[in-house]
Amino acid sequence: MPIKLPDTLPAYDILSREGVMVMPEDGAAKQDIRPLRIGLLNLMPKKIQTETQFARLIGASPLQIELSLIRMSDHESKNTSAAHMDEFYRTFSEVQATGEKFDGLLITGAPIEHLPFEDVTYWDELIQVMDWTQTNVHSTFGICWGGMAMAYHFHGIKKHMLDAKAFGCFRHVNQAPASPYLRGFSDDVLMPVSRWTEVRSDEIAAAGLSTLIGSDDVGPALVEDADHRALYVFNHFEYDSETLKQEYDRDADAGAPINVPVNYYPGDDPTATPMNRWRSHAHLLYGNWVSELYLTTPYDIEQIGLASTDLRK
């Protein structure tokens, strides 16, 4: 089954050309099944790029996915047109007012990691979102800053500034090969990393959380928070092949301090075309997450937050 998207959303045409199974909303309505409802709280400046990246990954599932785009209520996007936001997004306040529930929620990163969490203009509303997930979302996936924000809110785990930006493709170790989220993963995992902050392994462990993937160079990468039905990934499996290149070129052109991304360009030559060596693991991770949603979410969506099941038992 495909991912259900409005046929006017830019991601619809992009993913159709890539061979991803997408279906317009009127076609999906003809199928007599309950789709998995997944929300995307998009905190990134380039909304369309981010929508497409995550729709690509969750849309590779054989299950029908209904993707809902959500934004913060009082934060206006400076990099995406108001027309796009008005047509395709709802504010969190609007979603909350309906009382609706979701099988999954993705909370993206945001380029604000230099700020203390409490200084972020929408922090108070994000706290409401995170608390709301405990009654209205079956499983939440926090990405990069979004994952750090959840770990901080639920467990007081601090983010720590790095002396230099962790930037490039770093090798990680699969530390939990029996985890259902790592089904099909190799022992050695390459992940794109782009951040000025880190969370530390000892603080993750002290909070009772499980590190599933980690690196000696850049620390924990994928963490499971079973008590809050959440995963936190601090790196960027969703990145396109040239996302790190775009970030490098942007900073280099602006004269900002930036190193050539590690283990990304062939021969570390920024004039060479980068190769995508993380795509298969990206699809595995998000496909496994969607599979776990299907196996454990209540069939009656109104039971989310009240009950769960497991079709394997």
Swiss-Prot record:
Protein name per its UniProtKB record: Homoserine O-acetyltransferase
Record carries keyword Amino-acid biosynthesis: yes
User: Pathway membership of this protein?
Assistant: Amino-acid biosynthesis; L-methionine biosynthesis via de novo pathway; O-acetyl-L-homoserine from L-homoserine: step 1/1
This protein's major location comes to cytoplasm
In its UniProt entry, the species of origin is given as Jannaschia sp. (strain CCS1)
The entry's localization annotation reads: Cytoplasm
**GO BP, one annotated term:** L-methionine biosynthetic process from homoserine via O-succinyl-L-homoserine and cystathionine
Question: GO cellular component terms?
Answer: cytoplasm
Family according to the record: Belongs to the MetA family.
Which function does this protein serve?
Transfers an acetyl group from acetyl-CoA to L-homoserine, forming acetyl-L-homoserine.
